[in-house]
Regions:
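Polytopic alpha-helical membrane-helix bundles and their juxtamembrane interface segments
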Residues: 2-333
Length: 333
């Protein structure tokens, strides 16, 4: 028996444990969303629920980043160590962005148009795209026409879906706005009632002032930074859209380039992770554009699923790479 059999068997035994941990994390997240959701009368979720889903998402991205950095430190990874360094860095930045959004929204009660967390998200898209592109680049793609058409179709589908989300959001906003004049006239129909709302309007402003005071519990420096970043809201939204489409195109290319072969399974999982991220971002974009976003919606589970699939892809890639490098020496005595 070779002296290397002990560490090799340890690696083999860690693979099912890590795969099981990733799957269990995803199942636990889905069950938490389904079983413990408790929206109030206004549709908002309680703070303990928001804390729970944020911790599950942050933990999933940190865990997936560690698995990617594990591949980066291994000299046996077939797809290249730098590939997993950039993917791991992207996942780490995404986790840090979620931490900042949790602090801004749940701890400080802020809801700025642009915050520091947005920039961590944008950099995470850049790093993820760089890592996935490095995985495709060395393969010298010799795709046939149907395969290229599939990649182009995925890209066009992503662009059209993003356009549809924006158009649907604009129409959803236009419908209630069109109804406002009719409701306004109905309210003014009885002339005797007109002075009454005016008298009651003064005390109604008091709760609004209280809400503003409660929302300003963040440090003054943070409020100043949010005010400075607010003019960048359109540019940040455009960067998010470009990042989603680029990741979607690269994910489609990964599916085509790694469709068959021994090392295809890990990259199929990475592509699924990118698709999950895109799905969640499209739901988020629609909710933000229609001003109907409520943190803790069920579709947010796709963000955690994205981290889970990135982690699964890293585990499978490590297992396949280690087994392929040691297979010629397996029977050495």
């Amino acid at each position: 028996m070779s002296k290397s059999s002990t560490p090799t068997s340890a690696r083999d035994s860690s693979t099912p444990l890590l795969v099981g941990a990733c799957i269990a994390w995803g199942v636990a997240t889905l069950l938490f969303f389904l079983l413990f959701t408790a929206p109030g009368e206004d549709g908002a979720q309680p703070d303990w629920f928001l804390t729970g889903i944020n911790l599950l998402e942050i933990g999933a991205f940190f865990f997936a980043a560690l698995l990617c950095f594990r591949n980066w430190r291994s000299s046996q990874i077939v797809s290249g160590r730098n590939v997993w360094f950039w993917i791991g860095l992207g996942l780490l930045f995404y986790a840090m962005g979620t931490v900042l959004f949790f602090i801004w929204g749940t701890v400080w009660g802020l809801d700025p148009a642009v915050s520091l967390g947005d920039f961590f998200y944008i950099f995470s898209y850049i790093f993820l795209a760089a890592g996935m592109f490095k995985a495709v680049l060395p393969r010298r793609l010799n795709l046939e026409l149907p395969q290229w058409m599939m990649v182009v179709g995925i890209g066009l589908g992503g662009v059209l879906l993003a356009i549809f989300v924006n158009i649907a959001a604009a129409e959803a906003i236009a419908v209630p706005l069109g109804q406002v004049p009719a409701m306004h006239h109905l309210a003014q129909a009885p002339p005797d009632v007109a002075p009454a709302p005016a008298l009651e309007a003064a005390p109604a402003e008091a709760p609004a002032l209280e809400v503003e005071e409660e929302a300003s519990s963040a440090p003054p420096l943070i409020l100043q930074i949010d005010g400075m970043l607010e003019p960048l809201v359109d540019a940040v939204g455009l960067l998010y859209l470009i990042g989603d489409i680029v990741l979607l195109v690269i994910a489609g290319t990964l599916l085509v380039a790694f469709w068959g072969g021994r090392y295809s399974q890990s990259w199929k999982l990475i592509a699924i992770a990118a698709f999950c991220l895109y799905i969640a971002d499209m739901f988020f974009a629609y909710a933000i554009n229609t001003d109907t976003y409520v943190e803790g919606s069920l579709w947010e589970v796709f963000w955690t699923f994205s981290a889970i699939f990135f982690g699964l892809g890293a585990v499978v890639e490590h297992a396949v790479s280690v087994n392929s490098r040691r297979s010629p020496r397996r029977r050495r005595g």
